[in-house]
Amino acid sequence: MARGLNQVFLIGTLTARPDMRYTPGGLAILDLNLAGQDAFTDESGQEREVPWYHRVRLLGRQAEMWGDLLEKGQLIFVEGRLEYRQWEKDGEKKSEVQVRAEFIDPLEGRGRETLEDARGQPRLRRALNQVILMGNLTRDPDLRYTPQGTAVVRLGLAVNERRRGQEEERTHFLEVQAWRELAEWASELRKGDGLLVIGRLVNDSWTSSSGERRFQTRVEALRLERPTRGPAQAGGSRPPTVQTGGVDIDEGLEDFPPEEDLPF
């Protein structure tokens, strides 16, 4: 089993002054909404920028320390992890993946270019949006092709985590998507295989057949590597490293799950 690795690094601008609240047990919760744009070169050699909006959650003493100090438009660095949560509401099982901050720090914004979106929210150009994961596949890869013939694969990744002071391991179930040559390479993997993923965090939203709005946070892979366990697994083809133009939508804050649907 691959060792668990779960890291998120973000640099973006605060779209609004953060909200702080408390659980019934007195735990402070500070929610930060960050916005930025990822820049990369697509297959045709053209430079593209894709906007993103991510909600980051800070708990405990750090939440109380920063609660009154942060303002809309500030440039913020976040180091954290992806956290999978599952709960039940009205007899229906629900789940979400959120960014849990371990550390945040305001950055100097001088010389950094921001723009305003259609809702008047500041968004940082050439932001940082990086996720590094290592875990094991929970199912065989699902390879498909778009009508234009572009390969795309969906992967389920289980990342085990044991944090200091915790006796039991916790498993985070995360979704990964890869495109083109990287997708075709990943399609040869099988359930249980270890995988190192380096990519960017994106939010999907869609309307189900029943008319419900659905949300999913996933990782779009920019690089995949197969961990080896001894000489027997050291061979095999090396995965391509690609810069993908797979996401082409303006993912807005309206795509976040409503607060009443969250566990606290």
Swiss-Prot record:
Biased composition (Acidic residues): 248-264
GO molecular function: single-stranded DNA binding
Any one annotated GO CC term: nucleoid
Span(s) of short sequence motif Important for interaction with partner proteins: 259-264
Keywords carried by this UniProt record: DNA damage, DNA recombination, DNA repair, DNA replication, DNA-binding, Repeat
Subunit and partners: Homodimer.
Record protein name field: Single-stranded DNA-binding protein
Organism of origin: Thermus aquaticus
Protein encoded by which gene: ssb
